[in-house]
Amino acid sequence: MKRIYIIIGVALLLASCGKQYHAEKAVEAFVEANAEAPEKITHRDFADLGTTRHINDSLVTVMRQRGAEHYKRQISYPTMPQGDLYYLRMRYVHEGDTLQNTFYLDQELKEVVAFK
């Protein structure tokens, strides 16, 4: 019985590490494509991946309209997915300033749906 718990624990750990990796890669690709000067962004550090049910269509619309400093204005986003979203915070250095953004991703962790 103890072996089963260990196997389940290891499987869950590996699955969560895989999700974190895919989320980080999706965010990095989004930043490279949509930052005004991605070469000026250094020392990227990611928090743990989380899920949220508290983001609805109207909040996503507001985040998309506002964007964030140092990012392009006319960013092309995917359609708003149904259900829970994942979020990932990225802390980074931009020209000596430490900044942070939160990115919201679809359930497949392939696309950034919105960010703030």
Model-predicted regions and their roles:
Residues 17-116:
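Cystatin/cathelin-like cysteine-protease inhibitor module
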Residues 1-17:
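Sec-dependent bacterial lipoprotein signal peptides
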